[in-house]
Amino acid sequence: MQKFFVTSALPYPNNSSPHLGNLVGALLSGDVYARFKRNQGHEVIYLCGTDEYGTTTMIRARKEGVTCRELCDKYFELHKKVYDWFNIEFDVFGRTSTTKQTEITWEIFNGLYNNGYIEEKTTVQAFCEKCDMYLADTYLKGYCYHDGCRENRVISNGDQCEICQKMIDVNKLINPFCSICLTPPIQKSTDHLYLSLDKLTPLVQQYLDRVEFDSRIMAISKAWLEIGLNPRCITRDLEWGTPIPINLDPKLEKYADKVFYVWFDAPIGYYSILANERDDWREWLNSGVTWVSTQAKDNVPFHSIVFPASVIGSNIELPLIDRICGTDYLLYEGQKFSKSQGVGLFGDKVAEISPKLGINEDYWRFYLMKIRPETQDSSFNLEEFVRIVKTDLVNNIGNFINRVFSLLEKTPYRDLNYQISPEYIEFIKKYEVSMDEFKFRDGLKICLEMSSRGNKFVQSTKPWTMIKDGLDTQEIMTEAVGICWILLNLLKPIIPKSACDMLSNLDTDNQNIFCLIGGSNINIRILNIIKLPFKNIDLKQLREFIEGKN
């Protein structure tokens, strides 16, 4: 048994609900992987929480006329409600606006400061006179100046261009403007603290040389190194955030009115959220744990460059991320998700309309894993969603399980001894490799292929004619039920509620399917007959519910 620390990129609690792209990129991917590892028999802690500090929270709180704390309390509960509905099974779900977060951030900063990796700079920064505030990178927009984007007049945030994925120097943005009031900012000098990434480059390179990132994740990380790492500002002129430890050095007293940049201390939240849950968090993390992080591709450089540089430079004995499970972007009907523009489906809406449609979270989980943007951007399409539910969930998986148990109901066989065949051992092996490599689409594809094989087996053996003629069908039914049992076990990480509900009707002497790769027998007792597990979705009705017409 191994230990796995699975974390999903911490979502901002500055909106009422995450959209489906947020869910599939980090949280659902983390949940599927954590469940898979638990099914293998490993010890797993799956952790996430809300990333509560920063400009986005301040702006949202200002709009709603509440304090930042009140806003975070409100949206923490709303987000957790959505994640619970989608059956995302966290072992720990916390938040970053805690005393532990401050303590651990200070510990890391103090190490960096004492080791000479923090420098001071007086910089000229964009200041919006209308909003009376310095503009954080995410609230300063303009045209990206990098090749390819400059010619196409791509509008970028001030931290990183979403199109070319390159870092942005805010002073080089073309025609910058405040994203809040849309007016051009003035330039105003201010003092800030910088993380000396240039000095930390060799240590980051050593880290990247030893971790097991796949080629896509490594390419994103190495691209930053090839451009060259420069000192990065880690403080902001804000009120809401982790304060600077000004008592460390009298020189730091002038930073009393500043806080740490959210991307400096947000990943530290993985430590602090766990620390708030268990006192032995350091001991557990340093006990040979494999750390797997799930996230969208735009978060990768902060987790593979900035975060490890900070921890390594502090010289504190804390583990770092071993593997990153990254995705591209999920679009909605070909467009980028946007609540303000009414584009996309959001978690709270999905939870609202699903009971009206007579479906549960597994329908959405299934389709989202089917289209998971693993190697390129993909798009959620309502017509395709309805079609996939019909062809894959109802006609393939559902039909196979229903046929087997409808036939079994007509026989006296309730205690079966199943010898797994070499063909299905290979299915399990291929599935295990795919899931371990974060190829969840391939894992689901293997399940669908297995179900199709099962359907063909039933069709070719025609047990219904033998039952009608009073002939012995125990061998056929044992094989068919055994295939169902394997299939449902492999589907547990993807559609856990449906798979576990069906498996509860089967009592076995072995709950770990991956132990059967050696070819062991398994005894299966039928407790209840499984009924038709899935239903079709009416597209017209689905659209009406989404549009609020019903």
From Swiss-Prot:
Entry keyword annotation includes Isomerase: no
Catalytic activities: tRNA(Met) + L-methionine + ATP = L-methionyl-tRNA(Met) + AMP + diphosphate
Family, as annotated: Belongs to the class-I aminoacyl-tRNA synthetase family.
Locus of motif 'HIGH' region: 10-22
Keywords for this protein: Aminoacyl-tRNA synthetase, ATP-binding, Ligase, Nucleotide-binding, Protein biosynthesis, RNA-binding
Native organism: Acanthamoeba polyphaga mimivirus (APMV)
CDD domains in the record: MetRS_core (cd00814)
UniProt binding sites for ATP: 339
GO terms, molecular function: ATP binding; methionine-tRNA ligase activity; RNA binding
Record keyword Nucleotide-binding present: yes
UniProt-listed Pfam families: Anticodon_3, tRNA-synt_1g
Residue ranges annotated as motif 'KMSKS' region: 336-340
E.C. number: 6.1.1.10
Name listed for the protein in its UniProt record: Methionine--tRNA ligase
GO biological process, one term: methionyl-tRNA aminoacylation
Domain of life the protein comes from: Viruses
Single GO cellular component term: aminoacyl-tRNA synthetase multienzyme complex
